[in-house]
Amino acid sequence: MRRLLIVLLTLWAACAAAYTPVKFERAPRGKYRVVRIYDGDTFTILVPPDYTFNIRIQGIDAPERRQEFGMYARVYLERLIGGQDVEIYPMETDKWGRTAARCFNHEGKDIGLEMIKAGLAWYYSEYYKDPKYENEERMARAAQAGLWCRPDPISPQAYRQAPTAVKRKYQ
């Protein structure tokens, strides 16, 4: 009896030692719940059982949180996907560890495309090529939608590189 107990305990210890939880390098493809909206192009999802991943919407660059139109972009993204399930198609991991992904809401709408249509994001052609995104940005500019109502809006990339004094001017 004692020998059986030792064998069982040894087997249990070996199994416990061999068990390592799955660790993802980036969010896996699938449908997941949005648990936080950071800004107009970044949000956090929950992957069961309890993994969280920061997702960067592929192909767009939305105004920064403190930049003009930044809060509008964040609120609009919240309305599109906040607290809902989104389908993500991971493309790559960026230098900040976020999963850059194509994202679709529960209605099947392309989230990046919706942000561009609303005039609340730039088409980020440097990292993603999609003629639909380019065309929708052209149409949003022509309609002066969202940030395009300004004669020369500052891109998020230019805003990030600007000195603090310049940033204060555009908040």
Residue ranges and their predicted role:
Residues 2-171:
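Small beta-barrel nucleic-acid-binding modules, primarily SNase/OB-fold domains
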